[in-house]
Amino acid sequence: MDIVTRAENRRQEALLALDRNRQSELGQFLTPLAVARIMSSMVRVPQGKDNFYILDPGSGTGILLATMVDRILSKHPKAKIHVTAVETDENVIPYLRKTLEDCKSLGVHTELITQNFIDWGISTSKQYDVVIQNPPYYKLSANSPTVFSLKNIGYIVPNMYSAFMALGAELLKPQGYQIAITPRSWMNGTYYTSFRKRYISDLSIDKIHTFESRSTVFQESEVLQEIIIVGAYKGSVSPQVELSVSRDQNHIQVTRTVPYGQVVTDDFVFVPANYEDDKIVEQVNQARENLATLGLQVSTGKVVGFRLKNLLLSENIIGACPLLQPTNIATGIVEHPKYDSKKTQWFDTYNETSSKYIVPAGTYVLIKRFTAKEEKRRIVAAVYNAAEPAAFDNKLNYIHCSGEGIDIEIAEGIARWLNSDQVDAYFRVFSGHTQVNATDIRRIPFPSDSQLRGLAHSEDPGHDIVNILNIPKEVKVA
C-alpha cells in the first residue's frame, strides 16, 4: 500500500472520529483525496531540480503532503525532499505523525510544527519551494492578533484563509510555488481589495481550477461555498493562465489557456470556467463606457430598517414618503406601494434626521443587492420615476447623478442593459456570490450615451444589445 492510500485511509478514519461542530469552529475541512491529487498535479515541478522544500500549513492528516511527495518522487526518484507540516489540532496530529513517518520511510526529511502557523510563520527565517495548503475558513475580528501580525508585513486580511495565503506567499523562495484551495470570494469585492492587490503583486497566478458543483468538493463536511484552487509562483507575470474545471471531485472536464490579462486585472480576478465565459467577457468588453465616464454614480440605499424603526411608517400619512424595498422590484418594474409585502412601505420625512436618508424626486435605476434563490438572474434592475422624494432600503443600490435623479432615457437604457442575458453572464464570471455590490456595478462596462438612449426606445432590446456587442448571430448566451 503506497503512502497516498495510507494517508487517505487515515483521513477517512479521522472524519469518523472528529466532532463536526468542533471542525466547524476551527474552520477545518479535510481535503478529499481526488482534490489533493488535483492540487499536487498543478504544482510546478522543475526538471533537473533535486532539492525540494515543502510547507503544508494546517496539515490536517497530511493528505496534501503525501500526494505532493508522491508526485515529486514519481518524477525525480532521487530527489531530496524536506517537508514541514504545521498543525495545532491535537485530534488530528496522531494521524499526521503517521503520514510523516510514511514519508520518512521514503527518505524524506520531515518536521512537525505544533505551533500556531501565523506566530511561527512570522518568526521563521525558512523559505520553501512549494507551499500547498487548505487553510481554515473563518472570519477575523479587526483587533485579532493575526490581523496585526499580517499588517506588519503589509497584508490587510479579513479572515483566516487569506491570512494563511498571505503568509504562505511570504514564505516562498524566488520562483517558489503556492497552491491553495479556498472560497472564491477573495477574487472580487471591496472586502478583499487590499489583500487581493498585494497578493497578485507578490505572486503571478498561472493556474486556476474550478468545480461546477459547489456541494461535491467537500461533500463529507457539507461545505456549500464556491471553492476554487489557485496556483501562483513568486516571479515575473506569466503570459497565460491555465484554467481547468471539474464536474465533481473525480473528473477534470477541460483544461485550456487564456491570456493573463483576461483573468487578472488591477481590481479583480475573472474566473471564466469555459470557452463560453471567455467569449462573454470579450463581448461585453466591447462596451467602452462605465458609470464614471457617463457622469453617473452608484450608491447603496441608506435606510437600515432595524436601526431606524422610529422612522418606518406602516401607512401613507402626512409627512410620509415612499420607502423602496427589494420586494418592490421585479425585472424592469417597480411596484409601490406593494400591499401584500410584509416590508414597510413608507418613511417619515418630518423627523429632524430624516433628510440624510432621502433622495430628491427624480428618476433612478434601482438594483437589488441580493437575489433570491428562485430568481434566475444575479442582477435585477428597474427604473423608479419618483414624483416626490423617496428613501431606499440598504438592500438596494441606486444609480444617480451627484445624489439626484438621472435622464429617464438613460435610466431606461441602463436598466435594459443590466437586465440583459449578456451582462448577467458577465457578472457571474467575475463574482462568486449572489450579492451585487456598488463596487461591482462600477466595474461593469456600459454602452455609450447614444446607445443607451437607443435601448430605451428599442422594440427588441435583446437584438440591439447583440448589435452593440458585435456578437455573431450563431453565438447565444445560455
Segments predicted by a language model, with ranges:
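Glycine- and acidic
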Residues: 20-25, 54, 148-151, 360, ...
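Signature of N6-adenine DNA methyltransferases within the class I
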Residues: 24-25, 29-38, 58-66, 78-80, ...
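Extracytoplasmic/secreted proteins and extracellular or luminal domains
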Residues: 76-77, 124, 201, 317, ...
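Short, solvent-exposed loop/turn segments that connect beta-strands within catalytic domains
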Residues: 76-79, 237-238, 373-374, 405-407
